[in-house]
Amino acid sequence: MNMQITKILNNNVVVVIDDQQREKVVMGRGIGFQKRAGERINSSGIEKEYALSSHELNGRLSELLSHIPLEVMATCDRIISLAQERLGKLQDSIYISLTDHCQFAIKRFQQNVLLPNPLLWDIQRLYPKEFQLGEEALTIIDKRLGVQLPKDEVGFIAMHLVSAQMSGNMEDVAGVTQLMREMLQLIKFQFSLNYQEESLSYQRLVTHLKFLSWRILEHASINDSDESLQQAVKQNYPQAWQCAERIAIFIGLQYQRKISPAEIMFLAINIERVRKEH
């Protein structure tokens, strides 16, 4: 397939239009060397191509790749591919956010500027899959680029992966993580629990709290549920219901958000599962 160059970013990255008139950002060693806009290139020299979901994202990626070494982009692409194998489809913005983060993390490390991650402990426990991928990402960066980033970066990379699965940014992920931690603490103290983090009920609770936290921070809510079912849960699981109501009061005071009775019901069900294990 032949592609027409529309913009040369550097010797290794160009923007093209393919035969179907789709805009793409393509990479390949020396692919833009002594080339001009309007010329055509053969796909045999392309090592990687990106056709992101919008012209805006393609533009942001083009700007980013114009000043990032090919090796760094290729390394981040490998990390993203690995993440998508494990987590499923990620938002296209991950190509921009994670690559930009890793490039600056490498620069900070080379300048001996270390950025602590205050949420590292929480990220490890609340997002174990993403945290493991973050650990593997550091190994990939070390092997490919010869840079041994500190463990705090595991947490930052994991947060980018969490963000790419949802419709938020890093600030949103930090807010969700903080709210999840607070709710887990409230449940733990009410029932004097020692969480069994490998148990299915705990993992279900964490998953529920993650999506509940996103809904709370985005002013969304589940409202569609049978009132008789709510009453049944309240009667059958009175302790869990009371705990869920206390969490609703806390969120109202701390975040000025109102939780619907349906949300309280689903939260109580998940709390009861964990409480029963204790």
From Swiss-Prot:
One Pfam family name is PRD
Entry superkingdom: Bacteria
Record keywords: Activator, Phosphoprotein, Repeat, RNA-binding, Transcription, Transcription regulation
Gene Ontology terms describing biological process: positive regulation of DNA-templated transcription
Q: Which GO terms describe its molecular function?
A: RNA binding
Q: What does this protein do?
A: Mediates the positive regulation of the beta-glucoside (bgl) operon by functioning as a transcriptional antiterminator. This is an RNA-binding protein that recognizes a specific sequence located just upstream of two termination sites within the operon.
Q: Which family does it belong to?
A: Belongs to the transcriptional antiterminator BglG family.
What name is this protein filed under?
A: Cryptic beta-glucoside bgl operon antiterminator
Its source organism is Escherichia coli (strain K12)
